[in-house]
């Protein structure tokens, strides 16, 4: 016992011993109910090293004993009728405060302690700055190699759009593209593939192959439009707007409202179509039938029947220049009229013009007959003279 304990009265000493026993019993009972000590209520204390925990346990037990003695002494000085549970609550509160202080100190120490990774990479910044271009190249080469061996570098689908007369299967077959082909190979030969398709199909005027991420290709097709028909040997053929004549005959019952050229050869067809496509739609829609009517002065003279009842006569070589004047002329005349554009522009009723042509044809026939008669008479005279000469 301490000197203070010796100064106590026998009753006080017994009471002190009783309180100590009660405190120990309460402590044991608390340990039995709560496996973890009060100062372990913080998660920090659980993570401490074993040596630190033992040190804290020893320190806490010493402090608890001192606090217990001080509490008993204080209570004895103030009052001898205090209850043990009140003292225990004060001790527990003080122990919890000590635990919180220890946790705060440990957190501050952890913040100040340098990280293992920071010490590992300390001083490596200059080296990384020098090496990053090489590292970037290596990464790009690696990613590129992975892409080249992956299915994404091969074409997955090839589609065709804009085609009305040629099937998508035929266009895809003409392109030569297969699903196992490399995307880069197709991109490098893109223009060549487009030209091949255009040459294979006369109806196709232009082809554009577009790439769609990640590995799809689309051929956008633009086709030639239908321009006119040409009739040869009682068969009708379609002519495209580039002057190309489709060799397959067209059903006469399924003709569109397009001009029909009578017995034009391929060169004449192309010349007519080139001029025809420059005209306004209003004029083109009036033209129905085109025939060749050559004259002595104009060998490429043609007659164009119009849906308004008039007929235009113009040279094939001047079609694009002269025909645009027709609408203004048609407003000033009453159909049916013949608008002659061979030498200037003048109009004549169709019946009178036909009579004029008939008279002209008769005169021409008579002239030809007279010339033939003269040739016959001259031939007869020559024969008679040669006979007389031989008899002499």
Curated annotation (Swiss-Prot):
One GO cellular component term noted in the UniProt record for this chain: plasma membrane
Domain POTRA, first and last residues per copy: 153-224
Signal sequence coordinates: none
Chief subcellular location: membrane
Domain of life (superkingdom): Bacteria
Extracellular compartment segments: 153-392
Key words of the record: Cell cycle, Cell division, Cell membrane, Membrane, Transmembrane, Transmembrane helix
Subcellular location: Cell membrane
Listed transmembrane segments: 132-152
Region ranges (Disordered): 1-88, 368-392
Membrane topology per record: Single-pass type II membrane protein
GO biological process per UniProt: FtsZ-dependent cytokinesis
Compositional bias per record (Basic and acidic residues), positions renumbered to this chain: 14-32
Cytoplasmic side: 1-131
Coiled-coil ranges (or none): none
HAMAP family for this protein: DivIB
Function: Cell division protein that may be involved in stabilizing or promoting the assembly of the division complex.
Family: Belongs to the FtsQ/DivIB family. DivIB subfamily.
Protein name per its UniProtKB record: Cell division protein DivIB
Species this protein is from: Lactococcus lactis subsp. lactis (strain KF147)
UniProt lineage: Bacteria, Bacillati, Bacillota, Bacilli, Lactobacillales
Recorded name of the encoding gene: divIB
């Amino acid at each position: 016992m301490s000197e203070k304990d010796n100064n106590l009265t026998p009753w006080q000493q017994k009471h002190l011993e009783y309180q100590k026993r009660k405190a120990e019993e309460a402590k044991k009972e608390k340990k039995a109910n709560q496996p973890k000590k009060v100062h372990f209520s913080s998660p920090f204390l659980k993570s401490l090293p074993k040596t630190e925990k033992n040190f804290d346990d020893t320190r806490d037990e010493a402090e608890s004993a001192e606090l217990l003695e001080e509490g008993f002494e204080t209570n004895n000085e103030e009052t001898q009728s205090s209850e043990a549970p009140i003292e225990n609550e004060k001790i527990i509160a003080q122990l919890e405060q000590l635990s919180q202080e220890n946790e705060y100190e440990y957190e501050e120490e952890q913040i100040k302690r340098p990280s293992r990774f920071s010490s590992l990479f300390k001083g490596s910044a200059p080296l990384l700055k020098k090496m990053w271009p090489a590292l970037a190249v290596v990464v790009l080469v690696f990613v590129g190699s992975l892409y080249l061996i992956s299915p994404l570098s091969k074409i997955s689908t090839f589609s065709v759009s804009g085609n009305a007369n040629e099937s998508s299967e035929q266009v895809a077959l003409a392109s030569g593209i297969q699903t196992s082909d490399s995307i880069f190979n197709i991109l490098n030969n893109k223009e060549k593939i487009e030209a091949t398709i255009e040459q294979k199909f006369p109806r196709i005027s232009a082809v554009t192959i577009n790439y769609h991420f990640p590995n799809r290709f689309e051929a956008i097709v633009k086709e030639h439009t239908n321009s006119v028909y040409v009739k040869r040997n009682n068969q009708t053929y379609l002519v495209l707007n580039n002057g190309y004549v489709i060799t397959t005959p067209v059903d006469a019952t399924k003709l569109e409202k397009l001009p029909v050229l009578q017995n034009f050869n391929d060169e004449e067809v192309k010349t007519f179509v080139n001029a025809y496509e420059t005209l306004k739609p209003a004029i083109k829609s009036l033209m129905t039938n085109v025939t060749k009517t050559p004259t002595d002065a104009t060998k490429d003279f043609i007659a164009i029947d119009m849906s308004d009842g008039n007929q235009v006569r113009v040279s094939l070589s001047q079609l694009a220049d002269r025909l645009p004047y027709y609408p203004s002329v048609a407003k000033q005349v009453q159909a049916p009229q013949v608008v002659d554009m061979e030498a200037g522009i003048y109009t004549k009723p169709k019946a009178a013009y036909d009579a004029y042509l008939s008279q002209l044809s008769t005169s021409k026939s008579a002239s030809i007959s007279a010339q033939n008669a003269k040739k016959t008479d001259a031939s007869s005279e020559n024969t008679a003279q040669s006979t007389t000469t031989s008899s002499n």
